[in-house]
Design a protein with these regions (language model features):
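Positively charged n-region of N-terminal signal peptides that target proteins for export
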Residues: 1-5
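N-terminal cap/lid segment of alpha/beta-hydrolase-fold proteins
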Residues: 25-63
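Alpha/beta-hydrolase active-site loop
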Residues: 80, 116-155
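Short substrate-entry loop that stabilizes the transition state in hydrolases
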Residues: 61-65, 70-107, 196-197
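Primarily recognizes the serine-hydrolase "nucleophile elbow" in alpha/beta-hydrolase
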Residues: 139-228
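Boundary at the C-terminal end of the N-terminal hydrophobic targeting segment
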Residues: 21-23
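Loop/turn elements at helix/coil->beta-strand transitions in domains of secreted/extracellular proteins
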Residues: 49, 65-66, 91-93, 159-160, ...
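Bacterial N-terminal signal peptides
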Residues: 7-17
């Protein structure tokens, strides 16, 4: 039998985030201190563009810097991590923050709206639906891995000193990724979400979770729409 926390992952995979959390997103205009270098970048994750922000000291003390990949928590965006990115850059780190696919300024994940048309030369034109503001732990840990793939190609990155930082829901993600990627030498899990058995490990919730999965597999249940209430699966 699978551990109870596996069922928590299944259930949480398709939950939309609370709109109240999204409202806390930082405004686009913010001031970067004179001693910090800042730029934006695009990171590709499974073919989808993720919006990233890069922080580094303007006068680095070495050619290669210890690097921190930071990931936001449930319903957040990378903009919320700007104060931390600035603080770490001032301490001598190269910092990468990013919006998960379908969040913030990142592009949406796309799924076909119906059956795919015939291909021509390996290409097709199809109607698609965007998937946004859906908390999917499998996709999000993949996004963190792709952020690591990206940053090792940065000139300032020391590939032997890469660390992860995650808060809340992503605090659990960084533990998962660090256990599977030998390039990660350290991680910080701030109030990390590690175990949801208290909310899911009962027969009623398991039945509900698997019922949702069956309906989705049959195509009778769509992904939640953006802006739904916390915990809603409709």
């Amino acid at each position: 039998m699978r551990p109870a926390h596996v069922f928590a992952t299944i259930a949480l995979a398709l939950l939309p985030a609370c709109s109240g959390v999204r409202a806390q997103d930082a405004k686009p205009g913010f001031r970067v201190p004179d001693d910090v270098a800042f730029r934006t970048a695009d990171i590709m994750s499974e073919g989808t563009r993720m919006a990233a922000e890069i922080f580094a000291p303007k006068a680095p003390k070495s050619e290669k810097l210890p690097t921190i990949v930071m990931s936001h928590g449930w319903g957040g965006t990378a903009a919320l991590l700007r104060p931390d990115g600035i603080a770490f850059a001032r301490a001598g780190y190269l910092v990468v923050t990013f919006d998960y696919r379908g969040w913030g300024r990142s592009d949406s994940r796309l799924i076909p709206a119906g059956k795919a048309p015939e291909k021509k030369d390996g290409k097709l034109i199809a109607e698609v639906k965007e998937v946004r503001e859906v908390v999917d732990p499998i996709d999000q840990t993949t996004d963190i891995l792709n952020a690591i793939h990206w940053v090792v190609g940065e000139k300032l990155c020391d590939p032997e000193r890469i660390g992860l930082w995650g808060s809340s829901y992503s605090g659990g993600h960084v533990v998962y990724v660090a256990a599977r990627d030998p390039r990660v030498k350290a991680f910080v899990s701030q109030v990390g979400a590690m175990d949801s058995r208290w909310s899911i490990a009962n027969p009623q919730m398991r039945a509900y979770t698997f019922g949702q999965a069956t309906a989705r597999a049959h195509g009778s249940l769509e992904y939640p729409k953006p802006g739904g209430k916390f915990g809603s699966l409709t």
